[in-house]
Each structure stands twice: as structure tokens, then as C-alpha cells.
Amino acid sequence: MAAEEPQQQKQEPLGSDSEGVNCLAYDEAIMAQQDRIQQEIAVQNPLVSERLELSVLYKEYAEDDNIYQQKIKDLHKKYSYIRKTRPDGNCFYRAFGFSHLEALLDDSKELQRFKAVSAKSKEDLVSQGFTEFTIEDFHNTFMDLIEQVEKQTSVADLLASFNDQSTSDYLVVYLRLLTSGYLQRESKFFEHFIEGGRTVKEFCQQEVEPMCKESDHIHIIALAQALSVSIQVEYMDRGEGGTTNPHVFPEGSEPKVYLLYRPGHYDILYK
């Protein structure tokens, strides 16, 4: 009997370690599965797609899905084409960035205004307390893309830049920083729209600056105001009525960027 006691004493920590290993293996399995899903999404969806006929949307829903089929039909009265973005949580910023820069290829006056505002934006962020060393590379990439447009690059080359993961993600990071900066500058106004007892700064650190965090009204308003670029979003969901619900940010302005929103995702629209 005495010989068995050490074995019993050893079994307890072994069981504990085993559970720890199992938990770790489970966590790793989940992470591996998430990586596989992201890889599949990446293979199937470019960061920004070619321009497509809007009618491709019909095929994304069942023929007897009357709500969406009717809303697509309504959308077709106002728009002819769509350019899709990868559903990775960064789609709003990527869609905004490509849509506006593409439009600037044919609008030299707006290009010069936008370039001046964008050039000064780094200085504004630094004055707010953002570290220049931290944001400099992201700002440089942003300005490089604007200068690419200024040199009258082709839409195909601009699209290639946006589908380069590093370039595209650096642009997204900088647009997130601009959004955060504006929200914090205007914190007295925006604090009333933030739930959970968080400060505007906490909200920005948790919901705006990190990559892959989805965007809502508050993000759109802030970026539109920060760069003085009006955005019209067509909201398409399962709500009643056979029409999409357009919303212009800021209200009453003349839209320069047109986006389609379906729950959790933004794509680019063309008239």
C-alpha cells in the first residue's frame, strides 16, 4: 500500500498538466482554423476587385429571397457597377481609399485640395500626441498613392497598388489614424455616441486604430470630416420596404464616394 501512495500523489499534477496541454492544443487548433479561413477568404477575394456589373449581386442571394432581390432591383435604378472589397474588417477604409483616389484621376482641382489636406494631416496628428516616428511610414505610403494619382497612373496600376498587401494595409492604418485623430479632436461632440462608459480615447484605441475592427456611422462621419470628402452609403439589409436606405455623411453635403453596406461589409458603387 505504501508503494502506491507516491503514484497517487504524482497523478494529480499530471492530470493538471494534461488539461493545460489539452487547452493549449485546443487554442492552437482554433487559431489554425481561423488562419485557414482567412487564407481561403484571401484566395477567393482580392483586397479590391475589378469593376463588375451590379447584376452580379442577384446571384449572391436565393431567387426566392424577395427582400434582397427587390432591394438589388431598386439599387440598380441608381447604380450600374460595383467593386468588391475583401471582408476582413478593413473594407470601409479600403473601399473609401480606392474609390476617392480613383475619382481623383479625373478631378485635378479636388486632387490638389486633397493632397494639401493629406500632407498637413501628419503634422496635425503629431500635434495631438501621436508619435511621428510611429506614423511616418504610414503617412508616406498614403502620400505615395496620392502622388501616383497625380502622375496620372492607370486605374489598373492603382488597383495593383491596392492589392499589394503591404501598401494597402499601410493605407488602411493611416486612414484609421486620421479617423481616431478627428474623433479625439472633437471628443466633446462624439462622447455622447460612445457606449459602455468608455472615453473617446479608449474607444479609438479599442475600436478604431486596431486593424480588422469593423466601422460604423461614427467612423464614417469622422473620416469624411477629417478629409472633407463626402460619403454616401446605401444601406441594404433585411429591413422592411423594397428599397435601400441612402445616408450621406456629413448630412446635406455633395457625395464624392458611394458605398454599399450590407451587414458587416462595405463595397464600392458606381453610377
UniProtKB/Swiss-Prot annotation:
The active site is at 88, 91 (nucleophile), 265. It holds the Pfam family Peptidase_C65. The modification Phosphotyrosine is found at residue 26. GO terms for cellular component: cytoplasm. It comes from the Eukaryota. The modification Phosphoserine is found at residue 16. Its EC number is 3.4.19.12. Phosphorylation at Tyr-26 by SRC and SRMS promotes deubiquitination of RPTOR via a non-catalytic process. Keywords: Acetylation, Adaptive immunity, Cytoplasm, DNA damage, DNA repair, Hydrolase, Immunity, Phosphoprotein, Protease, Thiol protease, Ubl conjugation pathway. Residues 130-138, 169-177, 206-213 are annotated as: Ubiquitin-conjugating enzyme E2 binding. It is an enzyme of class 3 (hydrolase). The keyword Glycoprotein does not apply. GO terms for molecular function: cysteine-type deubiquitinase activity; deNEDDylase activity; ubiquitin binding; ubiquitin protein ligase binding; ubiquitin-protein transferase inhibitor activity. It catalyses: Thiol-dependent hydrolysis of ester, thioester, amide, peptide and isopeptide bonds formed by the C-terminal Gly of ubiquitin (a 76-residue protein attached to proteins as an intracellular targeting signal). One of its GO terms (biological process) is proteolysis. Residues 80-271 form the OTU domain. SUPFAM superfamilies: Cysteine proteinases. The modification N-acetylalanine is found at residue 2. By free ubiquitin: binding of free ubiquitin triggers conformational changes in the OTU domain and formation of a ubiquitin-binding helix in the N-terminus, promoting binding of the conjugated donor ubiquitin in UBE2N/UBC13 to OTUB1. The record marks 23 as: Required for proximal ubiquitin-binding. Residues 189-195, 214-221, 245-251 are annotated as: Free ubiquitin binding. It is found in: Cytoplasm. The keyword Phosphoprotein applies. Interacts with RNF128. Forms a ternary complex with RNF128 and USP8. Interacts with FUS and RACK1. Interacts with UBE2D1/UBCH5A, UBE2W/UBC16 and UBE2N/UBC13. Hydrolase that can specifically remove compared to 'Lys-48'-linked conjugated ubiquitin from proteins and plays an important regulatory role at the level of protein turnover by preventing degradation. Regulator of T-cell anergy, a phenomenon that occurs when T-cells are rendered unresponsive to antigen rechallenge and no longer respond to their cognate antigen. Acts via its interaction with RNF128/GRAIL. Surprisingly, it regulates RNF128-mediated ubiquitination, but does not deubiquitinate polyubiquitinated RNF128. Deubiquitinates estrogen receptor alpha (ESR1). This is Ubiquitin thioesterase OTUB1. It comes from Rattus norvegicus.
